[in-house]
Amino acid sequence: MSDFKVPPKAKGFKRLFKALFYSKDGLKCAWAEESAFRQIVILALFCIVLASYLTKDFLEWGLLILPCFLSVVIELINSSIEKAVDFTGTEFHPLAKKAKDMASSAQLIGLIFWAFIWGRYLLTLYFN
């Protein structure tokens, strides 16, 4: 067995404060270890800045950045599923492959949604 011990549970604002640090650690880990996460974040930042210049109001801006944030969240979930599956063992198992493939397909759907929203907006902008 490993020497890893689960820290005692905090309560109240202390729990919230600790949760923020756990989230920060998760983002640092994803940035350091997952190239797909870095690519999605860089693309999202570019699109958020571009949306700030292209849109006329807050609603348009919000609708354009929604798929950006959605894809970042999906990539975090995808990466965490991959890490959990890799932790369970190194040998190939069909269920492990299915879990990884389904998580990856969720990201594909998110990226298609992103392309659809931005493509439709840019076409509307171009033809008006």
Swiss-Prot record:
Report the main location listed first in the record.
Answer: membrane
Q: Which GO terms describe its cellular component?
A: plasma membrane
Spell out the reaction equation it catalyses: a 1,2-diacyl-sn-glycerol + ATP = a 1,2-diacyl-sn-glycero-3-phosphate + ADP + H(+)
Q: Which UniProt keywords apply?
A: ATP-binding, Cell inner membrane, Cell membrane, Kinase, Lipid biosynthesis, Lipid metabolism, Magnesium, Membrane, Metal-binding, Nucleotide-binding, Phospholipid biosynthesis, Phospholipid metabolism, Transferase, Transmembrane, Transmembrane helix
User: What are the required cofactors?
Assistant: Mg(2+)
> How does this protein lie in the membrane?
Multi-pass membrane protein
What's a single GO BP term from this record? phosphatidic acid biosynthetic process
**InterPro entries per UniProt:** DAGK, DAGK_prok, DAGK_sf
**Transmembrane intervals:** 35-55, 58-78, 108-128
Give residues annotated as binding a divalent metal cation.
34, 82
Q: Where does the record place it?
A: Cell inner membrane
The EC number(s) this enzyme carries: 2.7.1.107
Which Pfam family, just one, is annotated for this protein?
DAGK_prokar
Kindly list any coiled-coil regions of this protein: none
Q: Where are the active-site residues found? A: 75 (proton acceptor)
Q: What GO molecular function annotation could you give as one example from this UniProt entry? A: ATP-dependent diacylglycerol kinase activity
Family the entry assigns? Belongs to the bacterial diacylglycerol kinase family.
Tell me, what does this protein do in biology?
Answer: Catalyzes the ATP-dependent phosphorylation of sn-l,2-diacylglycerol (DAG) to phosphatidic acid. Involved in the recycling of diacylglycerol produced as a by-product during membrane-derived oligosaccharide (MDO) biosynthesis.
What is this protein's record name?
Diacylglycerol kinase
Species of the source: Helicobacter pylori (strain J99 / ATCC 700824)
Which lineage ranks, top first, belong to the organism behind this chain?
Bacteria, Pseudomonadati, Campylobacterota, Epsilonproteobacteria, Campylobacterales
Q: What gene name does this entry carry?
A: dgkA
